[in-house]
Amino acid sequence: MTDKIQCDYSALDHPAVLARIFHPGSGGVTGPARPNELLIPVDENVQIGACFHVEDKQAPTILFFHGNGEVVSHYDDLGPVYNQMGMNFFVVDYRGYGRSTGSPTVSHMMADCHTILDFVQNLLHKNGFTGSLGVMGRSLGSASAIELA
């Protein structure tokens, strides 16, 4: 077993860097939350928006960190595709994206992905999901996926 390496990402939290990294997507967030949408508490007064497309409690689940300029609702068409392939699909936003509160920073993104993973693992366990859990990221989301690897 290897020890987890702790990284300090605070140097990347400079406003000039953040302005180039994070571009919260617009659109796609209208009306009240749908039944498969959740808010994940990650910090005091900060919640991350998510959407859980469920196929089956025995199916594997993909925890998906989307790309920059996107929000959870942009994956409303892709979730059912994963379901048709026999997988559950759990897509999450970042601070300041979609229904999420707070402001995005690299440090927050990297810390939040650990809290999100814990939340998803607990949610699956409490609700009787028995399939495996995989993590996937696209573009900006690949950093969170690699952080959890």
Label the model's feature ranges:
Residues 137-147:
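Glycine-rich nucleophile elbow surrounding the catalytic serine of serine-hydrolase chemistry
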Residues 77, 147-148:
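Active-site signature of alpha/beta-hydrolase-fold catalytic machinery across serine-
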Residues 59-67:
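Short beta-strand element of the alpha/beta-hydrolase
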Residues 104-126:
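Alpha/beta-hydrolase active-site loop
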Residues 67-81:
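The serine-hydrolase catalytic nucleophile loop
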Residues 1-41, 48-51:
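An N-terminal hydrophobic leader/cap segment in hydrolases
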Residues 126-139:
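Alpha/beta-hydrolase fold nucleophile elbow
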Residues 82-101:
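Conserved alpha/beta-hydrolase
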